Amino acid sequence: MTNIRKTHPIMKIINHTFIDLPAPSNFSAWWNFGSLLGICLILQIMTGLFLAMHYTADTTSAFSSVTHICRDVNYGWMIRYMHANGASMFFICLFIHIGRGMYYGSYLLLETWNIGIILLFTTMATAFMGYVLPWGQMSFWGATVITNLLSAIPYIGTDLVQWIWGGFSVDKATLTRFFAFHFILPFMITALAMVHLLFLHETGSNNPTGINSDSDKIPFHPYYTMKDIMGFMMMFMTLLTLVLFSPDMLGDPDNYTPANPLNTPPHIKPEWYFLFAYAILRSIPNKLGGVLALVLSILILITLPMTHTAKQRSMMFRPMSQCMFWILVANLITLTWIGGQPVEPPFILIGQLASLSYFTIILIMMPLINLLENKLMKW
């Protein structure tokens, strides 16, 4: 009798995706993060569902309902902090996953890469709307500042902002629609992730060497399932340590003050995972210019396949490109730090220099160094 996993219509899909999938034999630990993102997504949907059971999307009771979850619901505090810090883990995995793609030239799988960029935008939108829901000071003012950026769009800007707000300021209508979108978007992310996997399995995975690995494949299960479980355990330990010992480490104390439209916090800033883009936004004195730079700081990922001038796919054997890559990582860490600092000297200048070097490294330095390496290797 033929094995059911190879004949049953649904089991067959699961089998070809997670069990009998031919995978390169030389995956490093950097290839763990795709599956970790899947686990993060499941965790966020589950904890989010339980939070939604007790949450009230109304300006008068949203803050109280979150307090009620933390005080009165059984393990409500844990569900809430798992969800909040789970988002941080999600973005850590996301940034490493993208960094891995940049380092090893995975962006040459065009469809997979482009769906990934759409996934990144959708995840950022979901996280932003989730941050508004507790209706604390930073929720309210973050929503006001970020949505207000759309008013920089010529001609339709002001109307667009008021249409998104559902009124003349961030209010009950805004909170209700943000809750609705925050609930539906993770399911869209799940669907997009499936398309992401579909396109990946059309071409097969890249590997650390960047060389075609058709001649040397191993089944995904048990080799990489075991390797992934190791990754899950490490991630869960990190997440639980964060949740149980310092759940508010990555949050903002201002969000424990109920939203007050009459009192502006001294420093309005988003969650840590948006700070690099926020720093780029603030480094340009012009409003429209800042908004464009903000969008381009993510959209720039689309240009990577076009600016890939190297003869080798991976950076594994290209020390100069490796050096440039780690300078880019250091640059992003600097931008993240600047995004959390007040707008005053010397932070303004550091932010402007870091923003300029971010775009320069990706658009100019990387392609030039690739060409130089080609020359040095006589290719």
UniProtKB/Swiss-Prot annotation:
Span-the-membrane segments of this chain are 33-53, 77-98, 113-133, 178-198, 226-246, 288-308, 320-340, 347-367
GO biological process terms, alphabetically, are: mitochondrial electron transport, ubiquinol to cytochrome c
Of the GO CC terms on this record, one is: respiratory chain complex III
SUPFAM superfamilies (alphabetical): a domain/subunit of cytochrome bc1 complex (Ubiquinol-cytochrome c reductase), Transmembrane di-heme cytochromes
* UniProt-annotated location(s): Mitochondrion inner membrane
One MF annotation (Gene Ontology) recorded for this entry: ubiquinol-cytochrome-c reductase activity
Task: Report the main location listed first in the record.
Answer: mitochondrion
Q: Which organism is it from?
A: Ctenodactylus vali (Val's gundi)
Can you say what this protein is called? Cytochrome b
Copy out the cofactor comment.
Answer: Binds 2 heme b groups non-covalently.
> What else does UniProt say about it?
Heme 1 (or BL or b562) is low-potential and absorbs at about 562 nm, and heme 2 (or BH or b566) is high-potential and absorbs at about 566 nm.
Residue positions annotated to bind heme b b562 are H83, H182
Q: How does it assemble?
A: The cytochrome bc1 complex contains 11 subunits: 3 respiratory subunits (MT-CYB, CYC1 and UQCRFS1), 2 core proteins (UQCRC1 and UQCRC2) and 6 low-molecular weight proteins (UQCRH/QCR6, UQCRB/QCR7, UQCRQ/QCR8, UQCR10/QCR9, UQCR11/QCR10 and a cleavage product of UQCRFS1). This cytochrome bc1 complex then forms a dimer.
Function of the protein: Component of the ubiquinol-cytochrome c reductase complex (complex III or cytochrome b-c1 complex) that is part of the mitochondrial respiratory chain. The b-c1 complex mediates electron transfer from ubiquinol to cytochrome c. Contributes to the generation of a proton gradient across the mitochondrial membrane that is then used for ATP synthesis.
